[in-house]
């Protein structure tokens, strides 16, 4: 079985870890992927409040939804912190990785993409000038065509898959 995966935002970090752990995964694309889970957690009183309530909410800046974050996620991370250290997995990953990042991402700064690129031995970095965290997409998407930045990211992903995945297996 040969698998190619794509991960966005926190899912970019998760998919990088999974690509490191799972030999079936042959190639990875991260879109606005995070480089570190630990520094995204609150500390001090905010951490204690989260623990006591079991959930905290953060507002999605695009949709204004209140997004739940359950304390169990933090506990799981702490119990498995070594496993969930993106930097370690990235530095030991021997698979092709495409890192796509927008320069106007309000949630994941482009510095994280540069770190991922530095850590991943077999990576390509693709920066999209002016692209935000969702590459111009929003929910609900009512248009016929993808936004230009997302279409650009999709085209680059297809190019990368053709070069690093499809030609090897078909």
Give the role of each language-model region.
Residues 28, 125-127:
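Conserved beta-strand scaffold positions in the cores of enzyme catalytic domains, especially
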Residues 1-47:
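Primarily recognizes the serine-hydrolase "nucleophile elbow" in alpha/beta-hydrolase
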Residues 95, 108-118:
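Short alpha-helix in the alpha/beta-hydrolase fold that links the catalytic acid
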Residues 131, 135, 139-170:
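Catalytic active-site module of serine/aspartate enzymes centered on a nucleophile-bearing elbow/loop
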Residues 92-94, 99-101, 105:
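Short beta-strand/loop motif that positions the catalytic acidic residue
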Residues 104-108, 133:
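Acidic catalytic loop of the alpha/beta-hydrolase fold
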Residues 70-89:
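Active-site nucleophile elbow and catalytic-triad environment of alpha/beta-hydrolase enzymes
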Residues 43-61:
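A catalytic-pocket lid/entrance helix-loop region that shapes and gates access to the active site
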């Amino acid at each position: 079985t040969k698998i190619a995966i794509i991960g966005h935002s926190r899912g970019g970090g998760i998919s990088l870890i999974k690509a490191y752990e799972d030999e079936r995964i042959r190639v990875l694309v991260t879109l606005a992927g995070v480089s570190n889970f630990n520094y995204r957690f609150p500390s001090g009183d905010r951490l204690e409040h989260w623990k006591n309530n079991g959930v905290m909410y953060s507002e999605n800046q695009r949709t204004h939804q209140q997004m739940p974050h359950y304390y169990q996620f933090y506990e799981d991370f702490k119990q498995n912190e070594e496993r969930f250290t993106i930097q370690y997995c990235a530095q030991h990953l021997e698979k092709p990785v495409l890192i796509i990042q927008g320069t106007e991402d309000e949630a994941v700064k482009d510095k994280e993409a540069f770190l991922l690129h530095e850590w991943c031995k077999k990576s390509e970095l693709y920066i999209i000038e002016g692209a935000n965290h969702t590459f111009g997409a929003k929910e609900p998407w009512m248009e016929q065509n993808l936004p230009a930045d997302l279409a650009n990211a999709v085209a680059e992903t297809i190019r990368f898959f053709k070069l690093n995945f499809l030609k090897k297996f078909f």
